Each structure stands twice: as C-alpha cells, then as structure tokens.
Regions:
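PAS-associated C-terminal cap
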Residues: 29-43
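Metal-dependent catalytic cores of enzymes that make or break cyclic nucleotides
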Residues: 40, 46, 53, 57-239
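Conserved Rossmann-like nucleotide-binding pocket used by diverse enzymes
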Residues: 24-27, 103
Length: 239
C-alpha cells in the first residue's frame, strides 16, 4: 500500500467466453488477515515445540541424575539417530519425531533403583530382568501424552530386534517401527563406545563390527549402512 503496509492477495483465474471469444476472468481476494493468523499460529507451534523439547530434556536430566555413568547418553543417541534418519532421507516430521523419542528413550529407568544402574559388577538375573522393564515403564509414562509422533511406541520398541530376540515383546521383522529400529542402532553404538561402571568403552572398530555383523539379523540393514557411512564416510563423532 502507499503507507508501506504489506497486503497479501490471492488470485484466481477462470477461463470464460466473453462476447464469443475465450477470455480470462481474474478475481483478487485480500487474505492479509488469514496470512497473519497463519503466521501467528506457526509462531505458537514453534514456541510449543520448543517448550516440549525443553521439557523432554529436563525429563532426561532427571533420569540421568540417578545414573551418572550415562549422563548425556540420550542426547548423544538423539544426535546420531537424527543424522541416520537424515541419511535415509526420511521426511522432516519423522526426523523430528525420532529425535524427540531418542531424547527420552530411557525414561523408564527412573523405576530402576540407582544402585542397580550404577553397580560396577555383573547384575543378577532378577536385577537384569528389572532393568529390562524400562521400555515398558517408559511406554506407560508417555502413552497418555498426545505427541504428533508415536513416541511411546518407539520408546517401547527400542530394544526389540529383527530376529525376535529383543525385549519386552520379542517383536520380529515387520512388526517393529522404523523409528525404533533407527533408535536401536544409535543406542547400541553410543552405549558400546562409552564407559560403563562394569566395563571400559569399546573401540570404534569393535562397536561398528557389532552392528555390521548383525545387519539383517538384529538390526535393519538400511539403518546399519547409513550409520556406518555416517561414521566412516562422513566422520560423525559424538560431542
């Protein structure tokens, strides 16, 4: 406008016959108010997503505070899982959902006593069985939260394996969400390459050999290939 205000318009062109000849009828509609409402809605969604992200990171820190040996584990897994998803050219919305799920994938460990999580010796059978409940506990914590992604199911399935040897449900190929399969590989790589109270960190070669030799048996082949290329070809490193 002459005053410098910006106005948004929508144009529609209709083919008509005018006085016996083909013509175009052009209609113009002022959609400035609608555009402003859309912009405000988008800003609100961005703020909401940032709030969700900050809340999830706070939840992760609460859980990790009980297990100092895994501090930062979920953030590092989230970073790798996100890059794997990008390497696989997944839709942006999927990538965001995978990142969110990874940030809190171990939230169910809040149910496991801290002395078990940080014990420097081998766990008993019953203690390990308790640790293995954390995907189910995480699912119960998250299932009533209305995320725009299947976060609770991804958390529930991140320890499932293609051959059915995983837990908690022993799911097999075709029944495990791709997001959970990506998270599974990222989780294994980060966990093996990090120090734990009961063992030193594995070498990078040993870690990559684990996912490579079990490609197609435990881990989804495309996910493994993308992860291997990220680390060996593109030089991905955990911060």
């Amino acid at each position: 406008t002459r005053s410098g205000d910006i106005r948004y318009c929508e144009f529609a062109v209709t083919r008509i016959v005018y006085k016996g000849e083909d013509a175009n009828l052009v209609s113009v509609r002022n959609i400035t108010d609608r555009k402003q409402m859309e912009d405000e809605l988008q800003q609100s969604l961005v703020k909401l997503e940032n709030t969700i992200q900050n809340t999830l990171q706070a939840m992760a820190k609460i859980q990790e505070a009980r297990d100092p040996y895994t501090t930062g584990h979920q953030l590092r897994v989230a970073a790798l899982a996100q890059e794997i998803a990008k390497e696989m050219y997944l839709p942006e919305e999927w990538i965001r959902g995978i990142h969110v799920a990874a940030l809190i994938h171990d939230i169910g460990k809040i149910y496991v006593p801290a002395e078990i999580l940080s014990r420097p010796s081998k766990l008993t059978t019953s203690e390990f069985a308790l640790v293995k409940t954390h995907p189910s506990v995480g699912y119960d914590i998250l299932k009533t939260i209305e995320f725009p992604w299947p976060i609770a199911d991804v958390v529930l399935q991140h320890h499932e394996r293609l051959d059915g040897s995983g837990y908690p449900r022993g799911l097999k190929t075709g029944n495990i969400l791709l997001e959970a399969q990506i998270l599974a590989v990222a989780d294994v790589v980060e966990a093996m390459s990090s120090h734990r109270p009961y063992r030193p960190a594995h070498s990078l070669d040993t870690t990559l050999e684990e996912i490579s030799k079990n490609k197609g048996r435990l881990y989804e082949p495309d996910v493994v290939d993308s992860c291997l290329w990220l680390i060996t070809g593109k030089g991905f490193k955990f911060n």
